[in-house]
Structure formats: structure tokens, C-alpha cells
Amino acid sequence: MITPMTTATIATLPITLSPQAEVVAKKRYFLKNDDNEIVEKAPDMFRRVADAIAAVEKQYGKLDIDVRLTSNEFYTIMSNLDFIPNSPTLMNAGTEQGTLSACFVLPLEDSMEGIMKAAHDTAMVQKFGGGTGFALS
């Protein structure tokens, strides 16, 4: 639990991922540079995600200190492995992509153009970790 004394960024908490989780995180979740080199570790990823999620609070009039407290609380529960968000959130929060949803229902029009648009949209959603379904009604 975050106390009112925790107004600054929490120091990096020790995070122990299983060997399997470390492999998956390196392959799918950690940010990479233009040379495809990993540029963050688990604490960095959790901070990136926590800061991005908490930043939304500013849109609803929250003070900077409240945003920081929310970020720290979210960072703590992730670091303790009490809660881990879905894959698109881990991959995209705090990046230009920003898609956090995991599931999308796409329209499918009964024409060649509509089918090809659905195929394109499906590929783009899946590129960023989302799953797709189609509205056939």
C-alpha cells in the first residue's frame, strides 16, 4: 500500500521474473531501439506502464501528486507480481502506439474492398498484440 509519504517516484523495487517470464518479456514486452536491442528491464517496463496508465488521471482534474501516487501504487502491485496487465498494455503503454485493448470486433462488409479492408485492419490490430473477431450480422 502506498502511504502519503510516497510522493516521489518509488525507488526501483526488486523484481524476480521466472526464467520463462524473462524470455517472454525480452521477446515481446521490453522496448527495443531501432537496432532491435532491448533498452529496458522489468522495472523500467513497469514504470513506463504505470506512468502511462496514471497519466490519464490528469484528464479528470487530478493533481500531479495524485497522478504520481496512482503511478506508484500501480508500479508496486506490478513489481510485487500481484497484478500484471494484458499483453497490449505491457507492449504499448507509454509508446506512440498506445493501444491497450486486447480484443477487437471488426466489421466485415460483403465486398472485395470490405474483405480486404478487414484483412488489413486485422493485421494491424494483431501487429500490436490485439485479438480480432468479426461482426457477421
Where in the sequence are the language-model features?
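Extended catalytic cores of very large enzyme megasubunits
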Residues: M1-S137
